Structure formats: C-alpha cells, structure tokens
Regions:
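Bacterial Sec-dependent N-terminal signal peptides
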Residues: 1-11
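N-terminal hydrophobic targeting/anchoring segments and the immediately downstream early-domain regions
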Residues: 9-181, 230, 234-388
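Extended hydrophobic secondary-structure segments
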Residues: 34-35, 194-214, 329-335, 339-341
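Distinct, well-ordered alpha-helical segments
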Residues: 143-147, 210-220
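Alpha-helix-loop-beta-strand connector modules within alpha/beta enzyme cores
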Residues: 179-195, 214-224
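Substrate-binding cleft of carbohydrate-active enzyme catalytic domains
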Residues: 189-203, 207-210, 241-249, 321
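Charged catalytic cores and adjacent phosphate/nucleic-acid-binding surfaces used
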Residues: 220, 229-230
C-alpha cells in the first residue's frame, strides 16, 4: 500500500503509520452512492470535502489507507404502496448500476468484493475492495425474490429499516411509533432468506423490539453497520448496553459511526431541527434528485449548529464503551461518510489514520486495532452460510 504526501503530513507517528499500512482497514458504511448519483461526480478523481461535501473517492481511499468499504445503496423511506416500492426498486437498481460502472471504469483502482477472501486478495493487489450493502429494506418491498436479486448484484448486508417503518419491520425513529411490534410476518421471511443466502442482517436503525426479534430468529451473527452507544448518547437510534451484550452473545459486531449527533448528545433545538428535516420525505416517493435536495437541506441545518460537532475522541469513547461491555471481538468501524459522518479531526476518508493513532494513544494493542479495523467484521462475514 502506498501513501501520498498528504497522508505523511498527518499527525501520525512512523510506528503507527507502519501499523496502519500493515493491517486491513474496512469501513462497513459509506454513502458514496449518494455522490455517484450527482451529475458529473467522478469517484476516480480527488475531491475537496469543503468544496463539494464529498468525503470518499478512490484516490482519497488510497491516500488515507482505507482498504475496503461497503458502499451503501441508500433508499429514503417512502410510501408503503406498490408505487412506492417500485420507485425504491428502480432507485436501488440505478445505484447498483452506478457502483458497477465506476468499478468497470477504474479497474486498476478498485474492485468488487463479496467475501473476506476477496478483500484480502484485492488489498494485496494494491486496490480498494468495494463491498455493497443496502441501507433500508424498502426496495425489497413485499417481494421476497428481490433479496436474491440484490444478492446476485453483490449485496452482502441489508439494513432492515431506516428512519421510518417499512414492510419488514419497525424503525427506532418513526414518529408514529411501531407498526408491526417488531418484525412483520414478511420480515421474518426476509430474515430467513438472508440467512439462506449468506447476507448479513444489519440491525442499525431498527427498533429495540425488531432487534430482539431478529436475534431470536437468525441462525447467523448479525451486524450493526453504523451504530453507537445509548449510554453515552441517549437516542433511540443508538444501542443500549443490554443490546450490545446481546450482539456479543450472538457473535456479531457493532460498527461505530462518525455522526456527531449519535456520538455526543446535541441540544434539543438541534435534535428537533434535524429530525424535522429527516422526516420531511417519509411517506413520499423520492427520486435521486429529490433525495439530493433533502440532503442539502439537512446539511444546511448541520452548518447552523456546527459548533455542536463531535471529535475524534468521542468516536474512541464509544469504542471503549463497547469493548468494556462486550469485549474487543465485537466492535468495528462504520463511518457513515457521505451520509452525515465526519468529526473534528476526521473529516474524510483520507484522514482515517488519525483514528488508528487515537486508538494507539488510548492503549489499544496492534492486535486489538487489527480486529477493530476489519478483523471482527470479516470474522462475522465468514460465519454467514451462503446457499449452495
């Protein structure tokens, strides 16, 4: 792995740099497809976060030493109707197309990965390993066959819900409260089908009842692709200590995200403003263009309240808490870059070595950091049982 001068100038000592170069770094939640949908955006060239809000591209992944990322095919929750599901499916398939086209355009920079072995092989070749996940089971609609269709396109995890309830399960943040009291009957079929295919079940964003329903049903370890600790930041989107223990008992992993308002509790004024923006399109069919405008409005709210932004230390605090509750084998990284992630000291993917340095400063061993940066997630992925 090679690093550019910009990486060398970051506040990371030579010993930590060598460690960062040696280990496989993996981020389970990157909303890069949101940027791919913007006209003229090219993931193969270097962008400036301050100029276009992009936090991920292939050159900056290489610059920062990010070996592997799950690009999240994200669908905002719309109407639970045939028309809404059809639009979500169209949107999802378009994002898969954009990811595959980007990989085809830059074969020397990045390659699709669908297994742990792929990640190690691609990293050894000096390229970026790009996995695919789906954030929000909404594009599955009520058609179980779509689970296999997305698997065939490279999907290796599905976040069952997002900010509102869908046909699969209840969300942790739907303002109308629960719809199914956890998993729906259809959601139980989806969990079984994901187990059959070897798709990781992602319980980030789901309600507490959904979470426990999934753990009672799944035959394989689960992931929380981008979730934090409720004990440190009291919000329904985060996980309680009992939930963290339950994930450990299941053999799964919790991937800490970099979203400020899930790391450190913001003011109630900011929370309400952000929730209002996030819920604005729930129940509506959103095109990629409409979703981009909604994201721009959300970004404007965050700019107004920018002084409440979290720091790199806050990320490590959540990692510390999970290790204390569940042990070193059940924590990882899911940044949510390009989807709200980013803190003071860690603005984009080019700066991820700063997290390695922060972990070293907190006393984590090289072995522990290797687990946090990808080893734990790849262990969970290897435990899935794909259909023969």
């Amino acid at each position: 792995m090679s690093f550019t001068a910009a990486f060398a100038q970051s506040p990371v000592d030579s010993k930590t740099t060598r460690l960062h170069q040696r280990i496989l770094t993996l981020d389970t939640h990157a909303d890069a497809p949101t940027m791919l949908q913007k006209e003229g955006f090219d993931v193969g060239i270097t962008h400036d976060t301050k100029r276009d809000n992009s936090q991920i591209d292939f050159p900056r992944m290489k610059q920062g030493g990010m070996d592997a990322m799950f690009f999240a095919v994200y669908l905002p929750q719309g109407q639970r109707t045939p028309e809404g599901h059809a639009e979500a499916k169209r949107n999802a398939l378009n994002q898969f197309r954009l990811i595959h086209e980007a990989l085809k355009k830059y074969p020397d920079a990045a390659e699709l990965a669908t297994s742990p072995a792929d990640a190690y092989r691609i990293e050894k070749a000096g390229k970026r390993a790009i996995f695919i996940g789906i954030e929000n089971g909404y594009p599955i609609g009520e058609d179980l066959s779509m689970v296999k269709a997305y698997y065939d396109l490279g999907c290796r995890y599905v976040t069952l819900s997002h900010f509102a309830n869908n046909a699969i399960c209840d969300s942790s943040t739907d303002p109308d409260g629960p719809l199914h009291n956890g998993l729906s009957a259809f959601g139980r079929q989806v969990v079984a089908e994901m187990n059959r295919l070897g798709i990781m079940i992602d319980i980030s964003h789901t309600s507490d009842k959904t979470f426990y329903d999934v753990l009672a049903l799944t035959k394989t370890p689960v992931i929380a692709s981008h979730s934090n600790c409720r004990a440190l930041c009291d919000f329904p989107r985060n996980m309680t200590d009992d939930m963290i223990r339950a994930v450990a008992k299941n053999g799964g992993v919790i991937q800490v995200n970099f979203v400020s308002d899930y790391l450190r509790k913001p003011s109630e004024e900011y929370r309400q403003a952000l929730t209002k923006m996030r819920m604005a399109n729930v129940g509506r069919v959103s095109s990629p263009e409409q979703a981009a405008r909604q994201q721009a409005r959300t970004d404007s709210v965050k700019q107004v309240y920018r002084n409440e932004r979290a720091s790199l230390a806050d990320i490590v605090n959540h990692i510390d808490h999970i290790v204390k509750i569940a042990g070193i084998d059940h924590v990882g990284i899911g940044s949510d870059f390009d989807g709200g992630g980013g803190v003071n000291g860690l603005e984009d993917v080019s700066e991820i070595a700063n997290l390695t340095a922060a972990l070293k400063s907190r006393g984590y061993s090289d072995k522990a950091i290797t687990k946090i940066w990808g080893g734990n997630l790849l262990r969970v992925m290897s435990k899935q049982q794909p259909a023969k």
